[in-house]
């Protein structure tokens, strides 16, 4: 430096800095190490020279021997240069250590400087009448001399150290041109630009990589980042292929873990196929876990468009269903919507047949509980809408009919409820033996609640707007009578 800062520092600081440091011990140790390295390099030169000399004569003579000799000669030249540089470094380190020892000897002891300052304070404190003025001047002159001695010692040390460092030449990089790195960026790398240990190739960062531009451990290929990848441009661990992101993938451009196929087709983990999302799916457009087929969602389904758990078939929802479009549990039919059904389009439980919507139904279009037959929506009915109606083989006390709506009606068209049996068609009363009855104790067709009179119209209420005689004559006369007002 052109203007060392120590020139402006008092002797208290310069002396303290020189005596507080580690001294010349590290410099002497460095000089010794460089000297030993130079000796080892010279020994290597002699050993390698004796071995390679046989490449130009004897059985090794030939093109391969000539090529090997060219490389060996280059290596020997580098070793010679390195040995010379090591010897120079050892000498310069020892020169700097010697300069430090000389500067330290010329530096004033910190204790002497401290004593001078202490005496100055004492004389100044007791100089009541000016009697200590000469002594104060002597002490101050001694302090200034100490300042000058420290600055001179530091200046000499700075000059000698700068001269020693200037004689050191930068080290050559011939060894790296051989493609072998030993003990610089790692342990042993083969190639160029590798950082780590056991790398073979170029510009690898990490350990035991083979290829170029790998980052991590145990990668084979180029541009891999992670561990144990085989291929190009993989990001993660244990990938095989190209451009995979994740772990354990086999294929191209896959994102996720433990997948096989081509990138952009699946998402999730462990999926095989196209458009799958979730875990462990096989097929097309599945979501969930462990599905096999097309468009399944849920868990452990197989088929097409199933949802729920452990379904097999087409469009089923629920659990443990087989066949098509089932909803519920344990259905094995087509379009069942409840549980344990074996039917066609059933929506209840334990139904067999077709299009049953109740429980324990069997037949076609049954909608009640425990019904058998067809077109029923009652309980155990055939074409009936009541409870406990039977379609055929009714007992003697209960005549058989159809379209009954009562309870218990074995006939037809009964709408009443009670203990009696209606054998007619659509009898809304009680104990009617006829057809479409609505009254009591009548038999026939369309009976009313009370018996009708023999004279037609006698049962119609009168409004007194027409007098009775005129009304009767009007019926007997062929012409239309005139109304007559009442008095």
Swiss-Prot record:
Compositionally biased residues, Polar residues: 428-446
Any GO BP annotation: symbiont-mediated evasion of host immune response
GO CC terms, sorted: extracellular region
Keyword Secreted belongs to the record: yes
Subcellular location: Secreted
Sequence segments annotated as region (Disordered): 398-487
Signal peptide from the UniProt entry: none
UniProt entry keywords in alphabetical sequence: Secreted
InterPro entries: Mycobac_pentapep, PPE_dom, PPE_sf
Entry keyword Cytoplasm: no
Major location category of this protein: secreted
Chain's role: Plays a major role in the integrity and stability of the capsule.
Entry similarity comment: Belongs to the mycobacterial PPE family.
Protein name, UniProt field: PPE family protein PPE10
Encoding gene, per UniProt annotation: PPE10
